[in-house]
From Swiss-Prot:
Domain notes from UniProt: The cytoplasmic gating ring domain of the closed KCNT1 channel harbors multiple K(+) and Zn(2+) sites, which stabilize the channel in the closed conformation. Under low-Na(+) conditions, the abundant cytoplasmic K(+) ions stabilize the gating ring domain in a closed conformation. KCNT1 contains at least two Na(+)-sensitive sites in the RCKs domain where Na(+) binding induces expansion and rotation of the gating ring that opens the inner gate. The cytoplasmic N-terminal domain facilitates the localization of heteromeric KCNT1/KCNT2 channels to the plasma membrane.
Domain of life the protein comes from: Eukaryota
Protein name: Potassium channel subfamily T member 1
Assigned protein family: Belongs to the potassium channel family. Calcium-activated (TC 1.A.1.3) subfamily. KCa4.1/KCNT1 sub-subfamily.
Effect seen on changing residue 769 to A: Reduced the Na(+) sensitivity of KCNT1
Length: 1230
């Protein structure tokens, strides 16, 4: 095929540069010559055209030719090179300015030398002229100008001054030439140029005219040129070292130099002019200037002639104009510096330790939480905190940072973490850690997370070796900051904690107390026994130690974990909860009896303080042993933990009771049964029940508490006889659809087939089922309702812990999501695989929505803080709507357990608020006193928080701060909350103490029983007790026997408290309609006893008050009946059955015993009788067990040894399940 010819360019028809036709072939290049080498042009040698190829002559044939291009040729000129050396180059120009500054200082020094060597009394005259003597006549008004015009200058001094003047003149001319920009007059009339000419040209003239060598030249004016050179030199110096935050330093330097120049000019000027007067010395003139400028004016030295007087006036006027301007600029810069915070010096960063706190906006609550928690650790007292925030300090933060306690340790810098200059100011690369916190009160929390992510990236880019501690809000954004050393996701922890609150009461309080640093001294001055006990146990935290270095645990090397946990608690009062192998990074909570301890293991334990700060007082231990064996003081109540020495022996716990019967003491309002008889064996009360010893090594028959895989009998679902529902088989597996990247896989109970989206809607029927209300579903267990604004990805973490594989299938509670907005498709896809999970659109402030979602059949209601209300125009008002709505629900549904999330922890005092409650006022005073004492847990005595009924996510901020010292705290917290699952690690659950368990008597004996029978580790108690909240204890008294009547009908006090694991749900007031008349009769009996006691125990005034309370109770009861009628009418209007509400609307005395700071029936009769609940973390071994106690347990992983021992478990599980994992949860048929 013939090749097509390229069309000719217009230039091809013209002659080439060498005169040859364009069409002629170009000379071939030598063989082997690279076409990349520059081609040699043809034509004559002198032809400029032959050396450079024209731009328009780039044809196809010349495209391979190259032209060497030289850049920045404009800088090759002589002027540009001089400009580069004298002006542009930072280091060379700095040297030039330093030389110029030294030159000016030298001229001022030479002037002072000339003044000191000059003596006017020896004669005055020009160079080589005859000298004339002059004496001042004070009476004459004429001035002899000769002493002012002529001075005595030595030859050597003159020569030096001439040389310096010539150098200064030449340098000035050169700089004028280099900085010339077209306007010469601008250069000439500059003050610095005029001064240069005045001080240099006369010296140059004296070279050619010798008589003028004694002419006076005001060389002292060079001080102003020196000041100008110093300013330029400092600017160049800062530019050379890349220091940009130097305005304050420059202004201070300018002000100081201005003052110095004014004084020096006035001193030298007055001294010279007074040569025609009294001939003042330089020192006297300096004294006069200082006295005059300081406005003192003694009058002992005064100028005598008018020129010197005129100079003084001029100098004062200049000072009055210049100095205020300088001071104004200095004050302005100082105020700006106060706002921006200045710098953290490099020297301090290298010699001191500091951490950096990066926040979007700094609020006083966040600041104090951080400072109190960070500086609660003794080894952090010498650390500095540098706060980097883009906003100005508000008034409250500024006031706090001016307190001497914080002003010496906290440095506030206004700046952005995205700017390297601000990170340099904070010396991020030298920091020990960087905490990056998100602004949770923003309306757009996703945008707040994005800002946090960028800050984390910026810090990692600038200081890759600085440890990062990042707080993120949304779980879907967590994977962007996985590179950080420690990450806390707020919504993950929040929802998991609220979920556990439904099955393990007050988990939020338990975790909050664990992650706060405390010495256990809160409430120790309170007269209330429960406050002292609660405050003392709140000081327990998680610590770690290497087993081989531990006095607590090293004696148990080679023993089982369970054996070590029990004996360490028995001997030292410490609670061993987990460990970590040296060759494994995973932390295992309660790995079980088959785990043998090694010296290299890292042990994690709960105690008041770490072992290194503990003292061992063995003498007291021996005394207490003797007392224990003699039967004295064994059951006198909870032992007091020593605070100063922290750890001493808790005494040996006797494992056999000393008697067959014991009447508990009534202390501080705690109540129990009148008689607690021990169970008998073979019909005889002579034998005491025994507890099996904890084995050093687990034998083959040792069982974990509940093996959910090998024993399926527990999970077999019995079809309901009256409902006729089809049995749905559940499977165990991992959820197939995670709503976000980075969620930890957890083995859960799942549906074998995903439920259609239409079946997830609770209040609307579909083609698969026609149920439109909760009762129609016929749930065996009570509902858990979650009220949230949107179905965010964090809500997924509420469901997973409640559907984890280790939860008994018979204990799974139906979950109803009450959402303000319709969930999206991705969220429904994630939850459709879980059994008994439904949603409904509605709001918590709408009664119809609450009734439709089945609130009267609910066991727990969780009210999640709404994102749209987290920010308010007025501080702390963000929770107003939530608080009022929850208060309304308490009035409408008093038997419901409600857990509320608040934005601000300080607002928890408004939960279940009663204005005339004297006990709440007393607690408020206690909180203020604890806050004044510097406690980190001042809010802990608020009854809603102590009972776990209120929670704020800001309480968990300390988890991130505490991780700086304890890098394992986030991992342990996530394991306890069920967010992470590690093979072989246990999980948190709870067990309820019933009257049948009271024979165990003490917490230490319970510890032994659980360790020996089911390998469970108890870590605390959730206690509910009655309390008399009265100003006069004699006014109203409640006998324990009065409570026994109701307990005989409804069971133990804590039967309404939801538990998890093997513990069971709460009884409702309407389990059997037939029992309500009996309960109401018991309530009336209680009221009659109360009415009989009141007149006896009080005088006439008390009786009158009692009568007024009775009248008030009648009014309140009518109010409750009105609310009840309102609810029933709405239920009838919606087509819902009212039988359930009729049952639960009537509360009895035992209901009150199970409510936290509630109890409308008894409380309306008198405002003093009530109950309270609180958490005891790791109580002493001899702490008395009480009915209604709920014990927190860490249960071993049931999958830990399935492969090795499934057969042995199967054979022996049948006769041990009744004792190891008792079923105490009553199933309520709806």
């Amino acid at each position: 095929m013939a090749r097509a010819k390229l069309p000719r360019s217009p230039s091809e028809g013209k002659a080439g540069p060498g005169g040859a036709p364009a069409g002629a072939a170009a000379p071939e290049e030598p063989h082997g010559l690279s076409p990349l080498l520059p081609a040699r042009g043809g034509g004559s040698v002198g032809s400029d055209v032959g050396q450079r190829l024209p731009v328009e002559d780039f044809s196809l044939d010349s495209s391979l030719s190259q032209v060497q291009v030289e850049f920045y040729v404009n800088e090759n000129t002589f002027k540009e090179r001089l400009k580069l050396f004298f002006i542009k180059n930072q280091r060379s120009s700095l040297r030039i300015r330093l030389f110029n500054f030294s030159l000016k200082l030298l001229t001022c020094l030479l002037y002072i030398v000339r003044v000191l060597l000059d003596d006017p009394a020896l004669g005055i005259g020009c160079w080589g002229c005859p000298k004339q003597n002059y004496s001042f006549n004070d009476s004459s008004s004429e001035i002899n100008w000769a002493p002012i015009l002529w001075v005595e200058r030595k030859m050597t001094l003159w020569a030096i001054q001439v040389i310096v003047a010539i150098i200064s003149f030449l340098e000035t001319m050169l700089l004028i030439y280099l900085s010339y920009k077209g306007n010469i007059w601008e250069q000439i009339f500059r003050v610095s140029f005029v001064l240069e000419m005045i001080n240099t040209l006369p010296f140059i003239i004296t070279i050619f005219w010798p008589p003028l060598r004694n002419l006076f030249i005001p060389v002292f004016l060079n001080c102003w040129l020196a000041k100008h050179a110093l300013e330029n030199m400092i600017n160049d110096f800062h530019r050379a070292i890349l220091r940009t935050q130097s305005a304050m330093f420059n202004q201070v330097l300018i002000l100081f130099c201005t003052l110095l120049c004014l004084v020096f000019t006035g001193t030298c000027g007055i001294q010279h002019l007074e040569r025609a007067g009294e001939n003042l010395s330089l020192l006297t003139s300096f004294y006069f200037c200082i006295v005059t400028f300081s406005t003192v004016g003694y009058g002992d030295v005064t100028p005598k002639i008018w020129p010197s007087q005129l100079l003084v006036v001029i100098m004062i006027c200049v000072a009055l104009v210049v100095l205020p301007l300088q001071f104004e600029e200095l004050v302005y810069l100082w105020m700006e510096r106060q706002k921006s915070g200045g710098n953290y010096s490099r020297h301090r960063a290298q010699t001191e330790k500091h951490v950096v706190l990066c926040v979007s906006s700094l609020k006083i609550d966040l600041l104090m939480d951080f400072l109190n928690e960070f500086y609660a650790h003794p080894r952090l007292q010498d650390y500095y905190v540098v706060i980097l925030c883009p906003t100005e300090m508000d008034v409250q933060v500024r006031r706090v940072l001016q307190i001497p306690l914080w002003s010496q340790r906290v440095i506030y810098l206004q700046g952005s973490a995205l700017k390297d200059q601000d990170l340099m100011r904070a010396k991020m690369d030298n920091g020990e850690a960087c905490f990056i916190l998100s602004s949770r009160n923003e309306v757009d929390r996703t945008a707040a997370d994005h800002q946090t992510i960028l800050r984390a990236w910026a810090v990692k880019d600038f200081a890759p070796n600085c440890p990062l501690y990042v707080q993120i809000l949304k779980p879907e954004n967590k994977f962007h900051v996985k590179f950080a050393d420690h990450v806390v996701c707020e919504e993950e922890c929040k929802y998991a904690m609220l979920a556990l609150n439904c099955i393990c009461p007050a988990t939020s309080t338990l975790i909050t107390l664990l992650v706060h640093t405390s010495r256990g001294q809160e409430g120790q001055e309170s007269p209330e026994q429960w406050q002292r006990m609660y405050g003392r146990c709140s000081g327990n935290e998680v610590y770690h130690i290497r087993m081989g270095d531990s006095k607590f645990f090293r004696e148990y090397e080679g023993k089982s974990f369970t054996y070590a946990a029990f004996h360490a608690h028995k001997k030292y009062g410490v609670c061993l909860i987990g460990l970590k192998r040296e060759d494994n990074k995973s932390i295992l909570l309660n790995p079980g009896p088959r785990h043998i301890l090694a010296a290299s293991d890292t042990c994690f334990y709960i105690n008041i303080t770490k072992e290194e700060n503990s003292a061992f007082i063995f003498k007291q231990e021996e005394k207490r042993k003797k007392r224990a064996f003699s039967g004295q003081g064994l059951h006198e109540g909870p032992a007091r933990l020593p605070v100063h020495s922290i750890i001493a022996s808790m005494g040996t716990v006797a494992m056999d009771l000393q008697g067959t019967e014991h009447r508990p003491t009534q202390s501080g309002g705690g109540g129990g049964g009148s008689k607690l008889a021990l169970p008998t064996e073979n019909g005889s009360g002579s034998r005491r029940p025994s507890i099996a010893p904890v084995l050093e090594l687990a034998d083959s028959s040792a069982l974990l508490p509940c093996d959910l895989l090998s024993d399926q009998s527990e999970d077999e679902v019995t079809p309901s006889d009256d409902e006729g529902l089809s049995v749905v088989e559940y499977v165990k597996g991992y959820p197939p659809n995670s709503p976000y990247i980075g969620s930890s896989p957890t083995l859960c109970h799942l549906l074998p087939v995903k439920a259609p989206f239409c079946c997830l809607r609770l209040d609307k029927g579909c083609k698969h089922n026609s149920y439109e209300d909760a009762k129609a579903y016929g749930f065996k267990n009570k509902l858990i309702i979650v009220s949230a604004e949107t179905a965010g990805n964090g809500l997924y973490n509420f469901i997973v812990p409640l559907r984890a594989y280790y939860r008994s299938r018979k204990e799974l509670n139906p979950i109803v999501l009450l959402l303000d907005n319709k969930p999206d498709h991705h969220f429904l896809e994630a939850i459709c695989c879980f059994p008994m999970v439904y949603y409904m659109e509605g709001s918590v402030d709408n009664l119809d929505s609450l009734l439709q979602c089945g609130i009267i059949y609910a066991d727990n209601l969780v009210v999640v803080d709404k994102e749209s209300t987290m920010s308010a125009e007025e501080d702390y008002m963000a929770d107003a709507k939530t608080i009022v709505n929850v208060q309304t629900m308490f009035r409408l549904f008093p038997s419901l357990s409600i857990t509320t999330e608040l934005t601000h922890p300080s607002n928890m005092r408004f939960m279940q608020f009663r204005a005339k409650d004297s006990y709440s006022l007393a607690l408020s005073k206690l909180e203020k006193r604890e806050r004044e004492n510097g406690s980190n847990l001042a809010f802990m005595f608020r009854l809603p928080f102590a009972a776990g009924r209120v929670f704020s996510i800001s309480m968990l901020d300390t988890l991130l701060y505490q991780s700086f010292v304890k890098d394992y705290m986030i991992t342990i917290t996530r394991l306890l909350l069920g967010l992470d699952t590690t093979p072989g690690s246990g999980y948190l659950c709870a067990m309820k103490i019933t009257e049948g368990d009271l024979w165990i008597r003490t917490y230490g004996r319970l510890f032994q029983k659980l360790c020996s029978s089911s390998a469970e580790i108890p870590i605390g108690i959730y206690r509910t007790e009655s309390h008399v909240f009265s100003t006069s204890e004699s006014q109203i008294s409640v006998n324990v026997e009065d409570c026994e009547d109701t307990r005989e009908v409804k069971g133990p006090w804590g039967s309404r408290a939801g538990t998890g694991g093997s513990s069971q749900g709460r009884h409702t007031g309407g389990g059997d309609p037939a029992e309500h008349p009996l309960l109401r009769r018991k309530s009336l009996q209680w009221a009659r006893r109360l009415s009989r006691k009141a007149p006896k125990q009080a005088g006439r005034a008390a009786a009158a008050e009692w009568i007024s309370q009775q009248r008030l109770s009648l009014y309140r009861r009518s109010e409750r009946q009105e609310l009840s009628e309102l609810v029933k009418n709405r239920m009838k209007h919606l087509g819902l059955p009212t039988t359930g509400y009729e049952d639960v609307a009537n509360l009895t005395a035992s209901d009150v015993m199970n409510r936290v700071n509630l109890g409308y029936l008894q409380d309306e009769m008198n405002d003093h009788q009530n109950t309270l609940s609180y958490v005891l973390i790791n109580p002493p071994p001899d702490t008395r067990l009480e009915p209604s106690d709920i014990v927190y347990l860490i249960r071993s992983d049931p999958l830990a040894h399935v492969a090795s021992s499934s057969q042995s478990r199967k054979s022996s599980c049948s006769h041990k399940l009744s004792s190891c994992n008792p079923e105490t949860r009553d199933e309520t048929q709806l």
